[in-house]
Amino acid sequence: MSMLVVVTENVPPRLRGRLAIWLLEVRAGVYVGDVSAKIREMIWEQIAGLAEEGNVVMAWATNTETGFEFQTFGLNRRTPVDLDGLRLVSFLPV
């Protein structure tokens, strides 16, 4: 089990309700919980299927250099980039 954080923007209410089944919504669109890898993958499938035009970032604790991993869904000005094996975030100007 590992700590999981999901941040959503402009997603349908049905996805927010679905996330609230497994995670605690601590602020509007911000969900946290302690889940297994299998549940994390299942949550991501729900996000990919229900997010529509919204965007989502999901981050979880891992045994890596940074101590976490993340993935994104949908259009966003922040895009993940790989720099020599280190995942960073590039901010695109308007």
Swiss-Prot record:
Q: What induces it?
A: Repressed by H-NS. Activated by LeuO. Activated by the BaeSR two-component regulatory system, possibly due to envelope stress. Part of the casABCDE-ygbT-ygbF operon.
The enzyme's first-digit EC class, named in words, is hydrolase
Q: Does the keyword Heme apply?
A: no
CDD domains named among the record's database cross-references: Cas2_I-E
Which InterPro entries does UniProt cross-reference here?
Answer: CRISPR-assoc_prot_Cas2_sub
Name of the protein: CRISPR-associated endoribonuclease Cas2
Keywords (A to Z) from UniProt: Antiviral defense, DNA-binding, Endonuclease, Hydrolase, Nuclease
| Effect of inactivating the gene | Loss of plasmid silencing.
The Enzyme Commission number assigned here is 3.1.-.-
User: Mutating R78E has which effect?
Assistant: Dramatically decreased spacer acquisition in vivo
Gene that this sequence comes from: ygbF
Q: What is known of its domains?
A: Substrate DNA-binding induces large structural changes that generate a surface for DNA-binding across the Cas2 dimer and formation of an optimal catalytic site.
Tell me the function of this protein: CRISPR (clustered regularly interspaced short palindromic repeat), is an adaptive immune system that provides protection against mobile genetic elements (viruses, transposable elements and conjugative plasmids). CRISPR clusters contain sequences complementary to antecedent mobile elements and target invading nucleic acids. CRISPR clusters are transcribed and processed into CRISPR RNA (crRNA). The Cas1-Cas2 complex is involved in CRISPR adaptation, the first stage of CRISPR immunity, being required for the addition/removal of CRISPR spacers at the leader end of the CRISPR locus.
Q: How does it assemble?
A: Homodimer. Part of the Cas1-Cas2 complex. Forms a hexamer with 2 Cas1 dimers sandwiching a Cas2 dimer. The DNA lies across a flat surface extending from 1 Cas1 dimer, across the Cas2 dimer and contacting the other Cas1 dimer. Only 1 Cas1 protein from each dimer is catalytic, the other interacts with the Cas2 dimer and possibly target DNA.
**Which branch of life, at top level?**
Bacteria
